[in-house]
Curated annotation (Swiss-Prot):
Keyword Nucleus: yes
Family label: Belongs to the kynureninase family.
Protein name, entry field: Kynureninase
Subcellular location field: Cytoplasm; Nucleus
GO annotation terms (biological process): 'de novo' NAD biosynthetic process from L-tryptophan; anthranilate metabolic process; L-kynurenine catabolic process; L-tryptophan catabolic process to kynurenine; quinolinate biosynthetic process
Described function: Catalyzes the cleavage of L-kynurenine (L-Kyn) and L-3-hydroxykynurenine (L-3OHKyn) into anthranilic acid (AA) and 3-hydroxyanthranilic acid (3-OHAA), respectively.
Gene expressing this chain: BNA5
Length: 453
C-alpha cells in the first residue's frame, strides 16, 4: 500500500471529487460510508456530480415552459441550449476524443441502432464482393447486426458471408499480422472489415490505423469500427486514419449513464456535397434534413452535409445533457491524451501487482496449481491495451467455480469489477476517478479471495 500512496502523491491529477463514488452503505454491503473500489468503468462509468444539475435544468424547462423550450430555453442566459439544438454543443467536445472533424460526428440512437444504420449505407454486397471480416467472439449484438443485414440483402446463409478471425491456438489475442494476411487473402471477396477498437472480452486494443490503411490498399473494401470500449479510453484519430465509419456507446468510459445516447462517425470523404452525385443512401429521418427546411414539412429530403445528416429523430434531451456533463470533464482534464497518460500509469501498475501475485501463472510457469489466473489482455506494449485487464481463472487440479467465488469475494469486500462467465473477471481503472490505492486494494482483495479457495 505504501507504493500506491506514493504514486497517488506523485500523480494526484484526477477528477475524483467531480464524481459520485458509491459507498459500502449505498450498495448494501455494510453500514460503512466509505467508498467502494470501483473498477467497472468499462461496463458503466460513474456519475459526474454535475449530471444531476444538468438533467434537473431540463426537467425544470419542461415543467416551466414545456414545448417552448424547444426554441427558447428559460436558462439560456446561463448557457443552456434550446432543445432544437441540444446536441450541437457536444460536437466540439466529442470530435477531439475520437480524432474527427466536427462535421464527421453526431450523437444519436444507441450503439447497435447506429451500427445497423451505418451498415445500410456502407455494406453493399455484390455477387463477387460480399464478405464481412470481424473477430470471433465479438460482442454478440454486432454479430446479430451483421447476420440480419445479410438477411435484409437476401443472403439466405449469412454464415457463409462471415470471416471471423480469432487468436492462434494457445494464444489469447489476435495478431495484427494475421488480420492483415486475412484481408489480403480475401481481398477479392471482402466488402467490409468491421472490428472492435478495443475487444470487449480480452481488452485487446487493435491497431486501427494500420489495419484501416492496409485494407484500403484494396479500393473496394470499406472499414468500420465498433468503438464501444475504445471511445474515452484510448486516443483515436479516425479522420487521419481514413476510417470509413464508426459507432460507439457513451455509458462506459464517457460516463453518460445507463443506456446513454450513442455516437457515430462518418468520414468527410463520403459526405462532401457533390452536385454530380446523389447523397449516400441511408435510414433517413427529419432530424437529418436541412434544418432551414425541417419545419416546412416538405416531402423532400436534403441531408445535412456530414454525420448530422444521418440523424433520424430529435435526440433525447436528458441523455444528451448527461453526455455533455461528462465530456466537459474530459476537456477540464485537458483532453484524451492526458487521460490516456494517467490510464497507462494505473493499468501498468495493476499489471505489475497482478504479475507479482503467487496465483499469477506466467506462460512459462510449468508447475501445477490448484487455482491460478492468467491475463488475457496483451500487456507487452502500451499500444496493445486500454484501461481494462481481463483475468482468466482456472485450476490444474480440477477445482471448480474459481471465478464466481473470487468475484463474489471481491464484491462482498467492496471491489466492483465485471464478471464474464465462465472464467473471466474484467478490471478497468478509470483515470478520471480511480486512484493507485484503488488498484492496490483490488489486487490485494483478489489475492485474499484466492487464499480462501
Amino acid at each position: 500500500m505504501e507504493k500506491a500512496l506514493e504514486l497517488d502523491g506523485e500523480y494526484p491529477e484526477s477528477l475524483r471529487d467531480e464524481f459520485n463514488i458509491p459507498t459500502f452503505k449505498s450498495m448494501g454491503l455494510s453500514s460503512d460510508d466509505k467508498p467502494v473500489t470501483y473498477l467497472c468503468g468499462n461496463s458503466l462509468g460513474l456519475m459526474p456530480k454535475s449530471t444531476r444539475n444538468s438533467i434537473n435544468a431540463e426537467l425544470d424547462a419542461w415543467s416551466d415552459c414545456a414545448v417552448e423550450s424547444h426554441f427558447k430555453h428559460p436558462e439560456e442566459a446561463r448557457g443552456k441550449v434550446p432543445w432544437v439544438s441540444i446536441d450541437l454543443p457536444i460536437l466540439p467536445l466529442l470530435a477531439p476524443i475520437v480524432g474527427a472533424q466536427e462535421n464527421e460526428v453526431a450523437v444519436m440512437n444507441s450503439l447497435t441502432a447506429n451500427l445497423n444504420s451505418l451498415l445500410i449505407t456502407f455494406y453493399k454486397p455484390t455477387e463477387k464482393r460480399f464478405k464481412i471480416l470481424f473477430e470471433k467472439g465479438s460482442f454478440p449484438s454486432d454479430y446479430y447486426a451483421f447476420y440480419n443485414q445479410c438477411k435484409i440483402h437476401g443472403i439466405s446463409e449469412p454464415e457463409n458471408v462471415f470471416i471471423q478471425i480469432e487468436p492462434r491456438e494457445g494464444e489469447t489475442y489476435i495478431r495484427t499480422q494475421d488480420i492483415l494476411d486475412t484481408i489480403e487473402v480475401n481481398q477479392d471477396e471482402l466488402a467490409l472489415v468491421c472490428l472492435s477498437g478495443v475487444q470487449y472480452y480480452t481488452g485487446q486494443y487493435f491497431d486501427i490505423g494500420r489495419i484501416t490503411s492496409f485494407a484500403h490498399q484494396f479500393p473496394d473494401i470499406l472499414v468500420g469500427w465498433d468503438l464501444a470500449h475504445a471511445v474515452g479510453n484510448v486516443p483515436l484519430q479516425l479522420h487521419d486514419w481514413g476510417v470509413d465509419f464508426a459507432c460507439w456507446c457513451s455509458y462506459k468510459y464517457l460516463n453518460a449513464g445507463p443506456g446513454g445516447i450513442g455516437g457515430l462517425f462518418v468520414h468527410s470523404k463520403h459526405t462532401k456535397p457533390d452536385p454530380a452525385k446523389e447523397s449516400l443512401p441511408r435510414l433517413a429521418g427529419w432530424w437529418g434534413n436541412d434544418p432551414a427546411k425541417r419545419f416546412q414539412m416538405l416531402e423532400v429530403f436534403e441531408p445535412i452535409p456530414g454525420a448530422l445528416g444521418f440523424r433520424q429523430s430529435n435526440p433525447s434531451v436528458i441523455d444528451t445533457v448527461a453526455l455533455r456533463s461528462s465530456l466537459e470533464l474530459f476537456a477540464k482534464f485537458n483532453g484524451i491524451n492526458e487521460v490516456r497518460k494517467r490510464s497507462l500509469l494505473l493499468t501498468n501498475y495493476m499489471t505489475e501487482l497482478l504479475e507479482a501475485s503467487k496465483y499469477y501463472k506466467h506462460p512459462l510457469r510449468i508447475e501445477k496449481l490448484p487455482c491460478f489466473f492468467t491475463i488475457l489482455t496483451p500487456t507487452s506494449t502500451d499500444e496493445e491495451h486500454g484501461a481494462q485487464l481481463s483475468l482468466y481463472f482456472d485450476s490444474d487440479t480440477g477445482k471448480e467455480d474459481i471465478m464466481p467465488k473470487v468475484f463474489q469475494y471481491l464484491h462482498d469486500h467492496g471491489v466492483i469489477g465485471d464478471a464474464r462467465r465462465p472464467n473471466v473477471i474484467r478490471l478497468a481503472p478509470a483515470p478520471l476517478y480511480n486512484t493507485f490505492s484503488d488498484v492496490y486494494i483490488a489486487v490485494n482483495a483478489l489475492n485474499e479471495a484466492m487464499d480462501k479457495l
